Regions:
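Active-site nucleophile elbow and catalytic-triad environment of alpha/beta-hydrolase enzymes
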Residues: 47-69
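Conserved active-site and cofactor/substrate-binding residues in soluble primary-metabolism enzymes
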Residues: 50, 54, 101-104, 139
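Alpha/beta-hydrolase-fold enzymes
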Residues: 1-50
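Short amphipathic alpha-helices and their capping/turn segments at secondary-structure boundaries
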Residues: 11-12, 63-73, 108-112
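Short beta-strand/loop motif that positions the catalytic acidic residue
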Residues: 72, 78-80
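Short, glycine/serine-rich, charged loops/turns that create anion-binding
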Residues: 83-85, 126
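Catalytic active-site module of serine/aspartate enzymes centered on a nucleophile-bearing elbow/loop
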Residues: 113-165
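Conserved loop-alpha-helix segment in the C-terminal half of the alpha/beta-hydrolase fold
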Residues: 77, 85-121
Length: 165
């Protein structure tokens, strides 16, 4: 598939392979459609953007790099939902889970980001973890604060030692 996709992307990178859907994940976010947040729908449409061959090709290339291992060189925190849910036309089914990505794939490949990765599944979190319902969002901020409390003193200590050397 990757060879075919690469070839197609060279000649038809703007070809649309999936059009925006009615409703979708955005309805679980935007306040006019049952969500909690107000944002510019031109920047993040409810049904997403058209998916093009070039976009899928770029994603696939990035995934292949990830599968080989990246090591981003810095500690990283990966917060994700604890489960995947189906994307539906209404927001109710997407309130408590990731309706965009397969979280089992995130769990499988997160360790390839670098040697200092912390992966934390957040119960009932949405795809955009910090846009989740209040309870999982509070858990996510708590985990972020704990991670920063753990990491920042180490980073400051290393910086100070490096400057003194």
């Amino acid at each position: 598939m990757s060879g075919t996709l690469r070839a197609l992307a060279r000649f038809r990178k703007l070809a649309v392979i999936r059009r925006p859907t009615e409703g979708g994940y955005g309805t679980s976010l935007h306040r006019d459609h049952g969500g909690e947040f107000d944002y510019n729908l031109d920047w993040k449409p409810l049904g997403g953007f058209p998916v093009t061959v070039g976009w899928i090709n770029a994603i696939r290339r990035g995934q292949l790099q990830l599968h080989r291992g990246l090591d981003v060189g810095v500690p990283n925190l990966i917060l994700r939902s604890d489960h995947t849910v189906a994307e539906t036309a209404t927001s109710v089914g997407m309130e408590r889970g990731d309706a965009v990505l397969d979280v089992s794939q995130i769990a499988r490949w997160a360790g390839c980001v670098g040697s200092r990765s912390t992966v934390i599944p957040v119960t009932d979190a949405k795809h955009d973890v910090f846009l989740s319902l209040p309870a999982p969002r509070a858990v996510a901020f708590g985990e972020l604060n704990r991670w920063l409390d753990w990491y920042l003193p180490q980073a400051v200590s290393r910086t100070t030692q490096h400057e003194q050397a």
